[in-house]
Amino acid sequence: MEVPSEIIQKLDILQNLIKKWNKSINLISDNTIPNFWQRHILDSLQLMQYISNKEIHLVDIGSGAGFPGIVLSIAGVAKVSLIEADLRKCIFLEKASKISNNSIQIINQRIEKIEIDCNILTCRAFSNLNTIFNCTQNISVREKFLLLKGKNYLTEIVKAKEKWLFDYLIHQSITCRSGKILEVNNLTKII
């Protein structure tokens, strides 16, 4: 994946900020710091290949350390809303948002209470599909969900299909053999 040097510089600033804040609020596992670029930055950046138009509104739920939301904003997504319930992490996200030239809104609330419209909804290391779909019912997602998932993605799909109708594509992660990107659209709850 080719990344312009200006973006790499901003992502380096983000990395240093995360390392500094991680000592006090545990944004990422210490075990992932040696592979920070692959584990966090590239894992987030790979979503750009599924975003055809950067002039969109993207909502990232359970934003934590800003993956993938802040990374996607730095990479050029025009408007990003980061939803995070933990106030300490929101304070970090506010600082980190200054690295991007694009619009970033920090929302310190539980996801279930948010009513917002967006083109794309993302999350990483958040929860299973049923939980994601349940807690985002008040969020109007016009295009798709882009969800970074691990090895249990098939089980999650099967369980979610019991309560939800949706179309999906499975893309291989470029950073982890067992990782997948689920591209979900046409989501409807089964009554």
Swiss-Prot record:
Sorted alphabetically, which InterPro entries does this protein's record hold? Answer: rRNA_ssu_MeTfrase_G, SAM-dependent_MTases_sf
Any GO MF annotation of the entry: rRNA (guanine-N7-)-methyltransferase activity
Binding residues for S-adenosyl-L-methionine = 62, 67, 111-112, 124
Class of this enzyme: transferase
Identify the Pfam families for this entry: GidB
Q: Name one GO cellular component term.
A: cytosol
Q: What reaction does this catalyse?
A: guanosine(527) in 16S rRNA + S-adenosyl-L-methionine = N(7)-methylguanosine(527) in 16S rRNA + S-adenosyl-L-homocysteine
Note the PANTHER family from the entry: S-ADENOSYL-L-METHIONINE-DEPENDENT METHYLTRANSFERASES SUPERFAMILY PROTEIN (PTHR31760:SF0)
Q: What does this protein do?
A: Specifically methylates the N7 position of guanine in position 527 of 16S rRNA.
Family affiliation: Belongs to the methyltransferase superfamily. RNA methyltransferase RsmG family.
Protein name (Swiss-Prot/TrEMBL): Ribosomal RNA small subunit methyltransferase G
Q: Which organism is it from?
A: Rickettsia typhi (strain ATCC VR-144 / Wilmington)
**Gene name per UniProt:** rsmG
